[in-house]
Amino acid sequence: KPQDRPNVAATLASLSIPLHLSTPEKFNPSQHPEFNQQRIELSPRSASSRIKGYTLSIGAKLVGITEINPLWIYAKRGEIFHENWDDWGREIELNHRYAVVFATEMAFELVGTAPHSSTTIASMANYAGGAFIATQLAAYIANLGYSASANHLRHYDAALVPLAVDAGLGETGRLGYLMTKDFGPRVRLGAVTTDLPLIPDNPVDIGVEDFCRICKKCARCCPSNSIPLDDQEAVNGTRRWKLNAETCFDYWGKVGTDCNICMRVCPWSHANTLPHKLIRALITRNRYSRKLFNLMDEIFYGKKPKPKSAPEWARYE
């Protein structure tokens, strides 16, 4: 729609990252930076601390480390960018043992407008920010003398949600996204795989599976019925709620955005105010709290919450 063009312009601008942050000879943000031949020796504990601290300092909200489960690695390259057709169908060979997985927070005021175009601005801004973080982190590890590969919007060697679960960032929710304690599903993920010896984090239990069994709000509100109302099922050696990706993506095409309705209505997606922080803390600890606050969420916000108005700068004229 013509009145939506300013938001489309902002969405596209969110993906406009510079090709070079310094001189081309100094730094070129590739997925596989050449590593320094003079390796800097670090203990796994020291390396893990430095890597996490650096990742948070350049914009990540959450970061964790895991040993890579081979099941999460994609078999072949399935997306083509910049007419690089030689890459299509190429087998992915990943010899890295560890993954550093991070999350960035999506803006609450933009996610709250889903499925309108302003929510896509938040998505693309986080994809671009994640690309920056992954690229810089991969370069940092390479400068230490180790092999590294940046995983972001334009390059994925592995499925990031199960990697993030293994790295202790959260649990997989009914809607198929990673559910984090502090932001719910309102995050975007990135990762760097590496052979730098690190100390893995442990998966966490924050009560997501139990809460999602009770809630089902994302499934009730999904306009394409892509999120199951049933229980988890066995899928490729895992047990999870199986999203219908085809009908979900088809609705994206119809609505012209990446929808995000499930993310908007999720009770874990509320702003990080003191009351909501307290509620999340109780939900992670007590099953009865999950039932109580699920009921309270429906009382205060409704069974099918309506989208909020976009910020003034992102509204239709």
Question: Where on the chain are the PLM-derived regions?
Answer:
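Iron-sulfur (Fe-S) cluster-binding modules
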Residues: 1-70, 74, 78, 264, ...
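Catalytic cores of enzyme domains
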Residues: 52, 61-285
